[in-house]
Swiss-Prot record:
Similarity section: Belongs to the bacterial ribosomal protein bL17 family.
Record bears the keyword Nucleus: no
Gene designation: rplQ
Protein's recorded name: Large ribosomal subunit protein bL17
Gene Ontology cellular component terms for the protein in this record: cytosolic large ribosomal subunit
GO biological process terms, semicolon-separated: translation
One GO MF term attached to the UniProt entry: structural constituent of ribosome
Keywords of this entry: Ribonucleoprotein, Ribosomal protein
Length: 123
């Protein structure tokens, strides 16, 4: 399977994708470079598919990848983390959709180094 190294070692790349995936689940839209977004898309798609499954094994698989960060409050006023948000809010939204949960929109080049910037968001 082809992938981009993103100028990092494998552990740094995995940490970067974990952070970006967690941020995308929490904020539902982030701005990043085009290459990072293209690498992030299949990771997030798999996480949402696990969220749709919703069983204990899927929860544990997601918990092993997504960071435990606060994702705001739910309807009851309790603080929820990124994993709870994925299973309670994000995955049910895509119950009828078979893949294609993310959208990448180009923003133009970054001012400092000219890297192509994009917004990746949940549909």
């Amino acid at each position: 399977m082809a992938y981009s190294k993103l100028g990092r070692t494998s552990s740094q790349r995995k940490a970067l994708l974990r952070d970006l995936a967690t941020d995308l689940i929490i904020n539902e839209r982030i701005q990043t470079t085009e290459q990072k977004a293209k690498e992030l898309r299949p990771v997030v798609e798999k996480l949402i598919t696990l969220g749709k499954r919703g069983d204990l094994h899927a929860r544990r698989q997601v918990a092993s990848f997504v960071r435990r960060e606060a994702a705001g409050q739910n309807e009851a006023g309790k603080t929820q983390d990124a994993i709870q948000k994925l299973f309670a809010d994000v995955a049910p939204r895509f119950a009828e959709r078979q893949g294609g949960y993310t959208r990448i929109m180009k923003m133009g080049p970054r001012r400092g180094d000219g890297a192509e910037m994009v917004i990746i968001e949940l549909v």
